[in-house]
Amino acid sequence: MLDFMDYIQLAFAEATNWNCDNSYSSLTATAQSLLDFSTPERLRVHLSSLATPHFATSYTLGTVGLIDGSVSYLYSTVPLNNTPSRSALIPLRKLARGYRQVQPPVAPVEDCGWQSCLGGLGSSESKPSGNDDSQPSPGRKATLLNATLHLPPPTILNALFLRRMSPTMQLSLAVCSTRGAPLSNSAPQASLLGQLSHDTGKYSNEYLFSTDNSLFGWRGLWNFGPDPRHPKENSSPQLSLLSAGAEAYYSPVSSLIGMSTGLRFSTLPAATEMPSSSSSASSTTTTSNHDTPISTFPYTLTLVLTPLTGSLSTTYSLRASPNLAFSSRFGFNVYSWESEMVAGCELWRKRRKPSPPPVDDDGLEWARRKMRMADTPAFAPVEPPTTHNRDEENESVLKIRVDQSWNVRLLWEGRVKELLVSAGVGLGPSSFSSPSRAANSTPAGGGQSVGGGISGRSYWHGVGVSISYSS
């Protein structure tokens, strides 16, 4: 489940119309959400709040074996007025990332008033002097500041500076500083990661630099098909999307070189929708006889190749129903002949709370309803159906992941009252070992076994619960 600050950062990206999925780093995001999810390892409590549309805070406390915590603050020049912040109102599918439907590429807004749009203003008119200063000026560009302090020692400080330079460019600066030992006189270790992103909808480029070993990097993604910046009139909706990308890294200090390339093919929402009856004459001649969608379910295929290490990875993810999704991954190394196979699924469940009976029901309510029906006219207007409040729905998701060594992860995420709860467990093949061997295993909270269970380790990879509350 996403942290509250990560959720606010996604809300900032949506408010500024920045497409986080149009990036090479998100090429395998769907498979990673279904296969590489992490389970809580102990008890953690999160308390968060969006105090104002511009300011958010978050506090975390972890216990069982080791007590630690963190304090996080976030400031945004863009007002997040339409962002649900209460844990009882936040859509669970935005926090528990599962199958991610790829959307068609969208061209950035290139009008001259994009600063005012990002600043939350509808016009460039000057505000009266008596108004509050909650809305930024039209010339101010969208900016986000976030800082997190992890305690106890060794103290770690993480800071993030995010700024929209133009409709197609975004600058990100991330700092990580670690305090040394108490008796050490050396300066705290710190590293800076800068990233400049350029997204046009048709393609995207990312330029990276890290002070750690003076690492330079580049990532790029190209979407095949029509250019969203030059739309054609009366064009049919795009049914699928093929994307190709690559990344390269180089460090002149350590002479480190890294590169990879990948492909992604995914169906778009138009492929699973029913053809409309008001389509053009040319389209009706081909689709009028078949009133069925092009694809019965959304799916995503990816292929990633790392030439230097000889690694090849393929993934296949599909959403069989709105509440059920599957994913699988196969990896192979041409140099060592080692392979990896992982499969996983997620199942969403929704349960509505039964409506309580009327308080003043004395057993004669049926007679009163009969009398009201007799007094109403024959053609009385039909009342619209009552919509269920979000609080009347309990939604939860169960994720399962297993690899070729029978290492299993189970994760349940849901809402209990006004709390967001995540509970998970990791199991391995060492569970079939003898009790004496399990007694001589690593201490409680020990590390995760690798590659099918090492002799002498407990089969419990990690058991934990995470509880979150936000206001």
UniProtKB/Swiss-Prot annotation:
Residues 429-455 are annotated as: Disordered. It holds the Pfam family MDM10. GO terms for biological process: establishment of mitochondrion localization; mitochondrial genome maintenance; mitochondrial outer membrane translocase complex assembly; mitochondrion-endoplasmic reticulum membrane tethering; phospholipid transport; protein insertion into mitochondrial outer membrane. It is a multi-pass membrane protein. It is found in: Mitochondrion outer membrane. Transmembrane segments: none annotated. Residues 444-455 have a biased composition (Gly residues). The keyword Membrane applies. One of its GO terms (cellular component) is SAM complex. Keywords: Membrane, Mitochondrion, Mitochondrion outer membrane, Transmembrane, Transmembrane beta strand. Belongs to the MDM10 family. Component of the ER-mitochondria encounter structure (ERMES) or MDM complex, composed of mmm1, mdm10, mdm12 and mdm34. Associates with the mitochondrial outer membrane sorting assembly machinery SAM(core) complex. Component of the ERMES/MDM complex, which serves as a molecular tether to connect the endoplasmic reticulum and mitochondria. Components of this complex are involved in the control of mitochondrial shape and protein biogenesis and may function in phospholipid exchange. mdm10 is involved in the late assembly steps of the general translocase of the mitochondrial outer membrane (TOM complex). Functions in the tom40-specific route of the assembly of outer membrane beta-barrel proteins, including the association of tom40 with the receptor tom22 and small TOM proteins. Lacks alpha-helical transmembrane segments, suggesting that it resides in the membrane via beta-sheet conformations similar to those predicted for other outer membrane proteins and porin. This is Mitochondrial distribution and morphology protein 10. It comes from Aspergillus fumigatus (strain ATCC MYA-4609 / CBS 101355 / FGSC A1100 / Af293) (Neosartorya fumigata).
